[in-house]
């Protein structure tokens, strides 16, 4: 212990006791560390012994498991050898069975072929019987479906027609009420104007007095009277687009009030000045108020404007009185009253209502949607003597609006001839849309070729076929459920050829009904007023509803093959064949 001094002994100047004390402390420290090391090594040995015992136990367990698995491997090897032997034996047996079954199948196929050859005659007889039965069933089902479809379409068409008729009648009554209100307001305005004219006439002197200028047509003419000022031509000559002038002249009185013209105060004034002044008047009521007959038998009278029927005699048109508009005083001129504004508002309302009426009329079903109905008053007048109270409506709508027949730029004429040609119509002139309500004829600006009907669609496809007639939804896009009977024929099951249903020898009555129904499509339907006689070019016997014809001669109207060919080649002459009652 003394031979191995510590690494850091005390210094040379230390005493022996200090050196000895330091060595003792070092010895004690090393002794304690040695005791701790012995304790820890003992614990480590115990843990290592435990680990060794545990490893030995695991080794014994793994050896036992390996022996067990070896026994299992030997068992599976034995089972595999046995299963392989059994599989080879079963495979040989199955191959023998397959060979036997193939021979049996070949024998059975030969027998089945012989049986099929023997059974062909019976199947042929059964097919003939089944085809005959199915042919009769298809014909019967087609007839039933056609009848049901036609009845349903007729019901739907009648309901739609009744609803639209009620709607159009209601709108027509509203138009009539507004017309009466406008007439009352115009009567009030006329009375006020006559009162104003009488007031002015009291202030005017004799025609030769110096109140008037010697040359009224000169542009610089002025009045010598301090109360009267003569308007110049530059002021009176308004443009064509002017609707109202500063002189609030009333319109002419209605047809029932036609009497002697108003007293001409200044009858010797030039006609040019009279024309320039009369151009700025409100629209006269001689044409646009009440419907005028074109040409009738000359044995009737002209009814009052409140009457619902106008079957008057010869065409009586009132020529508006050429009132001389004398120079007026600026102090006596009427201000812009509320009545003019109210009249303009009423006329605008009437135009809107007429537009609604035309929109409703455009939604009316055509003749293919509503069967033609024979009117009890259709043959009273011919098509050439059609009364002017009938509005001819075409599906093409080429004539424009019937609310205001002439553009608003046209001035109101002061001289209208009192007689018109027999086949023409009376144009209803108005100023800038300020027109009276009228159920008169539409202006047919073209010849009779414009109003001829288009060629029938049914004449090209149903001239020789008795297939189901096209429904009203066929040309107008309304979806319908597709029935088993299609538009061209019946689908025969089992792939057989179609029977003689579409090409049998029935009479042409069905085709003629279809052609008549399509012929009415291009004609002008005339929703006449209550009590107005309708005009029809030809006679339609019976109810006019297309019904299936029998094999024999039917009592309905027939269309020959030449008529069908003419309907295909081009439009025929004008024929107003569907002018039914609309009330």
UniProtKB/Swiss-Prot annotation:
It comes from Gibberella zeae (strain ATCC MYA-4620 / CBS 123657 / FGSC 9075 / NRRL 31084 / PH-1) (Wheat head blight fungus). Residues 219-235, 279-319, 329-339, 379-392, 399-422, 529-538 have a biased composition (Polar residues). This is Nuclear distribution protein nudE homolog 1. Belongs to the nudE family. Keywords: Coiled coil, Cytoplasm, Cytoskeleton, Microtubule, Transport. InterPro entries: NUDE, NUDE_dom. Residues 14-195 form a coiled coil. GO terms for molecular function: microtubule binding. Required for nuclear migration. Its main location: cytoplasm. Pfam families: NUDE_C. GO terms for cellular component: cytoplasm; kinesin complex; kinetochore; microtubule. Residues 34-68, 211-339, 358-583 are annotated as: Disordered. Self-associates. Interacts with PAC1. GO terms for biological process: centrosome localization; chromosome segregation; establishment of chromosome localization; establishment of mitotic spindle orientation; microtubule nucleation; vesicle transport along microtubule. Residues 35-67 have a biased composition (Basic and acidic residues). Signal peptide: none annotated. Residues 453-469 have a biased composition (Low complexity). It is found in: Cytoplasm, Cytoskeleton.
């Amino acid at each position: 212990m003394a031979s191995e001094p510590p690494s850091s002994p005390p210094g040379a100047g230390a005493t022996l006791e200090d050196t000895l004390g330091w060595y003792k402390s070092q010895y004690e420290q090393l002794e304690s560390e040695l005791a701790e090391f012995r304790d820890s090594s003992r614990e480590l040995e115990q843990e290592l012994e435990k680990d060794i015992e545990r490893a030995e136990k695991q080794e014994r367990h793994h050896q036992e498991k390996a022996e067990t698995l070896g026994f299992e491997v030997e068992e599976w090897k034995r089972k595999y050898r046995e299963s392989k032997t059994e599989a080879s034996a079963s495979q040989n047996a199955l191959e023998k069975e397959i060979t036997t079954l193939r021979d049996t199948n070949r024998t059975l196929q030969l027998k089945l072929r012989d049986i099929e050859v023997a059974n062909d005659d019976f199947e042929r007889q059964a097919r003939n019987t089944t085809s005959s039965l199915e042919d009769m069933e298809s014909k019967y089902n087609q007839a039933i479906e056609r009848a049901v479809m036609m009845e349903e379409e007729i019901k739907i068409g009648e309901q739609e027609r009744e609803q639209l008729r009620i709607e159009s009648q209601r709108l027509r009554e509203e138009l009539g009420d507004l017309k009466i209100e406008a007439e009352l307001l115009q009567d009030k305005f006329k009375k006020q104007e006559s009162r104003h004219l009488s007031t002015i006439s009291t202030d005017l002197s004799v025609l030769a007095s110096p109140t008037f200028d010697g040359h009224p047509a000169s542009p610089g003419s002025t009045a010598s009277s301090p109360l009267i000022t003569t308007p110049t031509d530059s002021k009176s000559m308004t443009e064509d687009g002017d609707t109202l002038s500063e002189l609030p002249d009333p319109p002419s009185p209605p047809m029932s009030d036609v009497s002697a013209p108003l007293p001409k105060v200044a009858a010797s004034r030039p006609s040019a000045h009279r024309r320039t002044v009369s151009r700025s008047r409100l629209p006269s009521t001689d044409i646009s108020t009440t419907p005028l007959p074109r040409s009738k038998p000359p044995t009737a009278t002209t009814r009052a404007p409140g009457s619902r029927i106008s079957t008057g005699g010869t065409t009586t048109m009132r020529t508006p009185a050429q009132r001389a508009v004398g120079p007026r005083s600026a102090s006596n001129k009427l201000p812009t009253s509320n009545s003019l504004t109210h009249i303009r508002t009423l006329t605008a309302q009437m135009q809107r209502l007429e537009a609604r009426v035309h929109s409703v009329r455009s939604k009316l079903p055509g003749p293919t949607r509503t069967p033609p109905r024979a009117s009890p008053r259709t043959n009273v007048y011919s098509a050439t003597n059609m009364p002017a109270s009938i509005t001819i409506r075409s599906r093409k709508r080429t004539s424009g609006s019937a609310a205001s027949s002439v553009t608003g730029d046209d001035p109101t004429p002061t001289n209208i001839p009192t007689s018109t040609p027999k086949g023409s119509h009376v144009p209803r002139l108005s100023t800038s849309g300020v027109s009276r309500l009228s159920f008169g004829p539409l202006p047919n600006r073209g010849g009779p070729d414009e109003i001829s009907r288009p060629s029938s669609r049914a004449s090209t496809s149903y001239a020789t076929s008795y297939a189901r007639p096209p429904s009203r939804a066929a040309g107008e896009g309304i979806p319908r459920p597709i029935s088993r009977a299609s538009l061209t024929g019946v689908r025969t099951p089992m792939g057989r050829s179609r029977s003689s249903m579409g090409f049998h020898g029935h009479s042409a009555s069905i085709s003629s009904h279809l052609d008549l129904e399509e012929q009415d499509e291009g004609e002008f339907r005339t929703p006449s007023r209550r009590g107005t006689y309708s005009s029809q070019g030809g006679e339609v016997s019976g109810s006019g509803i297309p019904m299936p014809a029998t094999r024999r001669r039917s009592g309905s109207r027939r269309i020959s093959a030449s008529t069908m060919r003419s309907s295909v080649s081009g439009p025929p002459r004008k024929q107003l064949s569907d002018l039914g009652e609309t009330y």
